[in-house]
Design a protein with these regions (language model features):
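Nucleotidyl polymerases of mobile genetic elements and RNA viruses
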Residues: 1-238
Length: 238
């Protein structure tokens, strides 16, 4: 039953999700997002500055609001029949909390998708796509200009990378994502959100730790766009 529902959801994902989302999609993966390395290298060749924000949401899958999710699925064009089947999977969920002082009474669970369920990744991708559309990033001028398009974000499920050619542009992108994600119950994990810049920093006012390198997927990205560290790392791993 779950595989049938997943196949149905995959059809909507293929239609609704943009190319920048590579998470849990057939024929896509982290290798697509590792293109960040080459973007940096090419940008540095043309003396361009580039700024990255590697976003981490606090307990992203656990914070999906069920009521908002059903409304979002409807707005994304998913049929009432399919949404009803999905709602039934989550209906009547209850839990208790056991502490040193005893066990609480049962209470209803209204948030979170099952992380071990094959449907969860599909549901989260559609949930995230909804609020990412609200950010207007697909229409924003901020980003990395290539010969054919403007790229300002790359995603693998809840792992989101924002990119721009100036610190002000990056700050603008980050604030838009922060505001819209909070509207659907997702919050940025500031301690785990990293900022990386290959250009000068004048008046940095963005939440997140400044780093000179970052592991994205299985590859190491550095501010200088040098692959030597990545090669050495893989040699050590054998």
């Amino acid at each position: 039953m779950l595989k049938i529902l997943q196949a149905r959801l995959q059809q909507y994902m293929n239609r609704e999700l943009p190319d920048v989302q590579a998470g849990f999609r057939k024929g896509r993966g982290t290798r697509d997002q590792i293109a960040n390395i080459w973007i940096i290298r090419k940008a540095r060749e043309f003396w361009k500055n580039i700024y990255f924000s590697f976003i981490d949401y606090a307990k992203a899958f656990d914070c999906v609001d069920h009521n908002k999710l059903w409304k979002i699925l409807k707005e994304m064009g998913i049929t009432d029949h399919l949404t009803c089947l999905l709602r039934n999977l989550y209906a009547g969920q209850e839990a208790t909390v056991r502490t040193g002082h005893g066990t609480t009474e049962r209470f209803q669970i209204g948030e979170g998708v099952h992380q071990v369920c094959t449907l969860s990744s599909c549901l989260f991708n559609l949930y995230e796509e909804y609020f990412m559309r609200s950010t207007g990033l697909h229409e924003a001028q901020a980003g990395i200009q290539t010969s054919r398009r403007n790229i300002n974000n790359l995603r693998y499920a809840d792992d989101t990378t924002l990119m721009a050619e100036s610190e002000e542009e990056l700050k603008s992108l980050l604030m838009k994502v922060k505001e819209e994600s909070e509207k659907v119950g997702l919050k940025l994990s500031i301690p785990k959100t990293k900022i990386m810049a290959s250009g000068p920093i004048t008046s940095w006012q963005i939440d997140g730790e400044m780093v000179t390198d970052f592991i994205l997927g299985s590859s190491q990205i550095t501010t200088v766009g040098d692959c030597s560290c990545e090669i050495k790392r893989h040699l050590l791993l054998g």
